[in-house]
Amino acid sequence: MSLGLVGRKVGMTRIFTAEGDSIPVTVLDVSDNRVTQIKTVETDGYTAVQVAFGSRRASRVTKPLAGHLAKAGVQTGEILKEFRIEADKAAELSNGAVIGPDLFEVGQKVDVQGVSIGKGYAGTIKRYNFGSGRASHGNSRSHNVPGSIGMAQDPGRVFPGKRMTGHMGDETVTVQNLEIARIDADRKLLLVKGAVPGAKGGKVFVTPAVKTRAVKGAK
């Protein structure tokens, strides 16, 4: 249970180390994360912090949500996100407080969650990296078919989870243990090593890494 940030994927670029090594990074805009509600065990049954990100026209906000944000004294947001945290950390925050990239530090490992790019209806070759059939030598109109999907009368059905054609992408994906390569505090940017799910402009959630990789040989 850790506090995180809501951000927007700006795109990918690269930075250079002092030794001249090139590092591919994804730029995340995490500006203007503001607290809209502090949930406690007494009032809500659990402890969490609700954060708003981005902006939205007042005409596009429902009256209940507009009242909720007005009560907190917070500008209308494009998205609301809850982070479950400990009670002592929640007590340090208040409605309207702004959370910035200083929540993290360079070298820290984080988990980044986003919605992957939708690819539409795809075959098994593109979707699951299946191999193609033979181009000739007896193969007739079966070059890209997946092959058999079942057995005989017993069991007489296709097992659940069978890899077949279908909708590809547009799924919630979490990439774990990405390292923060650089923090631009002035522009509220996080530069994360490697790729992040989603297209440019997509929303992402950045939280401290849950699973840390063990160092081989360490005691």
Swiss-Prot record:
Xref: PROSITE patterns: RIBOSOMAL_L3 (PS00474)
One Gene Ontology MF term: structural constituent of ribosome
Description of post-translational modifications: Methylated by PrmB.
Similarity comment: family membership: Belongs to the universal ribosomal protein uL3 family.
Assembly notes: Part of the 50S ribosomal subunit. Forms a cluster with proteins L14 and L19.
PANTHER family, per database record: 50S RIBOSOMAL PROTEIN L3, LARGE RIBOSOMAL SUBUNIT PROTEIN UL3C
Name by which UniProt lists this protein: Large ribosomal subunit protein uL3
Species of origin: Burkholderia thailandensis (strain ATCC 700388 / DSM 13276 / CCUG 48851 / CIP 106301 / E264)
Lineage summary: Bacteria, Pseudomonadati, Pseudomonadota, Betaproteobacteria, Burkholderiales
